[in-house]
Amino acid sequence: MKKNTDSEMDQRLGYKFLVPDPKAGVFYRPLHFQYVSYSNFILHRLHEILTVKRPLLSFKNNTERIMIEISNVKVTPPDYSPIIASIKGKSYDALATFTVNIFKEVMTKEGISITKISSYEGKDSHLIKIPLLIGYGNKNPLDTAKYLVPNVIGGVFINKQSVEKVGINLVEKITTWPKFRVVKPNSFTFSFSSVSPPNVLPTRYRHYKISLDISQLEASNISSTKTFITVNIVLLSQYLSRVSLEFIRRSLSYDMPPEVVYLVNAIIDSAKRLTESITDFNIDTYINDLVEAEHIKQKSQLTINEFKYEMLYNFLPHMNYTPDQLKGFYMISLLRKFLYCIYHTSRYPDRDSMVCHRILTYGKYFETLAHDELENYIGNIRNDIMNNHKNRGTYAVNIHVLTTPGLNHAFSSLLSGKFKKSDGSYRTHPHYSWMQNISIPRSVGFYPDQVKISKMFSVRKYHPSQYLYFCSSDVPERGPQVGLVSQLSVLSSITNILTSEYLDLEKKICEYIRSYYKDDISYFETGFPITIENALVASLNPNMICDFVTDFRRRKRMGFFGNLEVGITLVRDHMNEIRINIGAGRLVRPFLVVDNGELMMDVCPELESRLDDMTFSDIQKEFPHVIEMVDIEQFTFSNVCESVQKFRMMSKDERKQYDLCDFPAEFRDGYVASSLVGINHNSGPRAILGCAQAKQAISCLSSDIRNKIDNGIHLMYPERPIVISKALETSKIAANCFGQHVTIALMSYKGINQEDGIIIKKQFIQRGGLDIVTAKKHQVEIPLENFNNKERDRSNAYSKLESNGLVRLNAFLESGDAMARNISSRTLEDDFARDNQISFDVSEKYTDMYKSRVERVQVELTDKVKVRVLTMKERRPILGDKFTTRTSQKGTVAYIADETELPYDENGITPDVIINSTSIFSRKTISMLIEVILTAAYSVKPYNNKGENRPVCFPSSNETSIDTYMQFAKQCYEHSNPKLSEEELSDKIFCEKILYDPETDKPYGSKVFFGPIYYLRLRHLTQDKATVRCRGKKTKLIRQANEGRKRGGGIKFGEMERDCLIAHGAANTITEVLKDSEEDYQDVYICENCGDIAAQIKSINTCLRCSKLNLSPLLTKIDTTHVSKVFLTQMNARGVKVKLDFERRPPSFYKPLDKVDLKPSFLK
């Protein structure tokens, strides 16, 4: 295959982004954005949030104030590494301490006098414990000197039970674009949120709604619950911007379709009529009257001037330091979009579009919780001071209130999966797939309550805005999370920015904008508004917009602003806006730059020769105009060519229409999809199913499983895949392995391997083929007195325990064995008993079907004895275990065949696995055949011409034709054996061999597809799911077997099982299982008159309904199931009467059977 040609330049540039970039501080690209997000929080943002100085209470017109000051914030890393934390069974936390001072300020003639009320210097080792994110090589952001373990990528937290936790990224509820909604015909709303910049703490949120009803245009109002007045949007814009209504009319009508202009005129005319209806109308007086009315309505304690100042100053918090005039122009630009959206809704980004949303990363979770809990902490201090002053007359604070900030509980809840009372953010790391370390932190999902609303079911669809930024294959295909969790593509990441960087960047951009001629950036009537994070800063001359955007993008790429991830979006289509985004939580990815119809990659001749020695940051620095980091909003409003090949086939005029060009198709997949092979050669559903199965594959975990008491399934003899993609290699998924190479044959075997059944060779299993070891944690808590009690009668369950009451190391546990002594004793109140002490065993037993060896035992002594046992078990493939290829050809072991039963080739080689050949045709997985062909070709030429081992690159999605791969295989075979004939060469290339029948030693009539492939073992193991039970516990309500193997549960016998038995005519079995089984039998008496169930009063059965009517009905005894009685009782409790009626049948008479003569025939 050709290498480093011009046609592959885009592919090579894409690969540069995936590999580590130490010059830019990128050591592991897939999770780098998570590391930066958390590092920003714990190194910078936490100090900003906790460092506080503000008034708690004020008296006597602010001449006396109770102040709180939090300072000396210090964060200390743990003394040990994550491995030591796991061995000790402890969490891996950083300690945060601070000093709290509460004092009283009194304003006097001499100045301000300060009186100390309370002080607390937080040195408590449990004040605030912040879970530390473990990064690449076991690093943490507080102590970068920790040793590196190259295969440990981290991305996990360790909680107090030493359980590893990983989280997904949630889509933020607040949208950056206003949400348009049709309330009813001709009635619309436009809702938007305003959030203060990151440098303003505490963060202020305001939510506004603009309403418009065509039948009542005078009521086109803007409102906000308890934070703003309800006022006509046009008059508010006029009040803030200090312009005339005609100015607003011209601004709204500029570059609008005729139908929108008509609506604009109607709205302005309605506002005029509103002003004319008021005598001597004055806009200031009108607004002041509304503010006074709101002041009275809210019964505010503030003066009217303070109330008005607070309301107008806090209006639009995201434009906190912006003059009112710019706020007015911003409202006019919002109204433009609103009116246009009424007629052209499809052209406006809808609420499900990722353009409108930011993403919450790990650091943002902790930042939000720290901010909320700090406000609760300060509120508790304020309430405590007020209560003490009210009850005792002193300003004092209880020390308990000062020492309980509440952050520990919030962080603990976060790692339990609850972020702000919403489930789904964090989960326990599954210890069977190393790949989950990458896939879970790179997945993006929605709040659960965001999807409970029926109107938001459309959020489950693959939205057009997700194209290129999200993997279209790796989405859940079943269950409640269908379509809700998406994987980022390999080139996508999420932006992070420090507060200081944010302010510097905002300042530089504003200086650049103001460097233009003043009149050109003051086109507020007919210009294009320029916003930075939705805050209006200027309005540009329409004739300059293209030059401005082009120049801005060039300066951005050259590092003029000091940030390469700034997003600039030119919104045309009559909405007319230039949006500059610099905040955190934006989705970004690189694109190839097209400038004036030229692909900039092609106009840099030095790039190709120097590319091998450069990192991605070097390319951005030395060839800045080749690649641009583009956020999802800029991408949506830009013209992007799908591939370099298509771009080069266009004419010059067509090329000039494009701004960007995409990388090859393999970079649109996520890291899980990249572990598959050639999904574009298969049917569509195979990609989705393949991603789900790849995440279930058992891999080789890098953590020290013998020193960690934790659950896990681990591949014992893993092999690195031969056929890989670049993403699989750079993410270290390939190096950490998730399968083995096996020899397969596609054929039928005695009719055993039908459907998903596979045949596996016995000797292959005995040699350790796809062998795994299961590590399992067993944890019990025992009362101290029970643990110290001695058993009176020797129990078989305690045969594996030592004299100290704990299970022996290296003991083999079987089902029913106890893991620690737990004997409960009780004293009988019987004076005649010789020994009134009785004891009985209440220990938890080992419940697995297979024997396990005890590897480690840990004991903690508190008020209870906590025993943790780690067991290990080697588990070879057995019947029913599941396996799969990387093309979603899942199979279940149907038969384990001896080598002598299997067909063999001319060299005596037998296949390790036999797969049903019809599965290729039914599932259309052509790439599975290609993988076998490429793996076989590698086996004859595993080294390149330089003598280096080279895996075969077969990306998950690629534009390479199958003929190219066949040609590559042909070259490999011709190089190793140039004397092959055409037929022999064809058989080698297409892996076709003549196999011999093991019973007759004669060749089969047709050739068989026979070759090596990378095979995966899935976590679905027979012995983990199989359950055997004859009798046991039942549920109280329905009296069926309880659920769960661990609880000794069984199979619930329901309607489907009943129907199966009915189909077989097993009437007696049905009666026995459903009615006559133990306590399920129920005798009831039925009143033949009214059909009620008779009640039992003083051991006498009577019908309550008939007895009140002085009737004497006949009671008939019937036997029924307990479930039927429960059903009737519940229906009666809900006011529904179910009448039990008896079927009246005439008696049936059968004729006598014919007599049978049993005499022998010769006696007759």
From Swiss-Prot:
State any GO BP term from the record: DNA-templated transcription
Reaction(s) catalyzed by this protein? RNA(n) + a ribonucleoside 5'-triphosphate = RNA(n+1) + diphosphate
Q: Which GO terms describe its cellular component?
A: DNA-directed RNA polymerase complex; virion component
Q: Where in the cell is it found?
A: Virion
Q: What PROSITE patterns does the entry give?
A: RNA_POL_BETA (PS01166)
GO MF annotations in UniProt = DNA binding; DNA-directed RNA polymerase activity; metal ion binding; ribonucleoside binding
Q: What class of enzyme is it?
A: transferase
* Transcription found in the keyword field: yes
**Which cysteines are disulphide-bonded?**
none
EC assignment: 2.7.7.6
Q: Which Gene3D superfamilies does the entry link to? A: 2.40.50.150, 3.90.1100.10, DNA-directed RNA polymerase, subunit 2, domain 6, RNA polymerase alpha subunit dimerisation domain
Alphabetically ordered keywords of this record: DNA-directed RNA polymerase, Metal-binding, Nucleotidyltransferase, Transcription, Transferase, Virion
Q: How does it assemble?
A: The DNA-dependent RNA polymerase used for intermediate and late genes expression consists of eight subunits (147) kDa, (133) kDa, (35) kDa, (30) kDa, (22) kDa, (19) kDa, (18) kDa and (7) kDa totalling more than 500 kDa in mass. The same holoenzyme, with the addition of the transcription-specificity factor RAP94, is used for early gene expression.
The entry's family comment says:
Belongs to the RNA polymerase beta chain family.
Function, in words: Part of the DNA-dependent RNA polymerase which catalyzes the transcription of viral DNA into RNA using the four ribonucleoside triphosphates as substrates. Responsible for the transcription of early, intermediate and late genes. DNA-dependent RNA polymerase associates with the early transcription factor (ETF), itself composed of D6 and A7, thereby allowing the early genes transcription. Late transcription, and probably also intermediate transcription, require newly synthesized RNA polymerase.
Q: What is this protein called?
A: DNA-directed RNA polymerase 132 kDa polypeptide
Provide the species name: Camelpox virus (strain CMS)
Lineage of origin:
Viruses, Varidnaviria, Bamfordvirae, Nucleocytoviricota, Pokkesviricetes
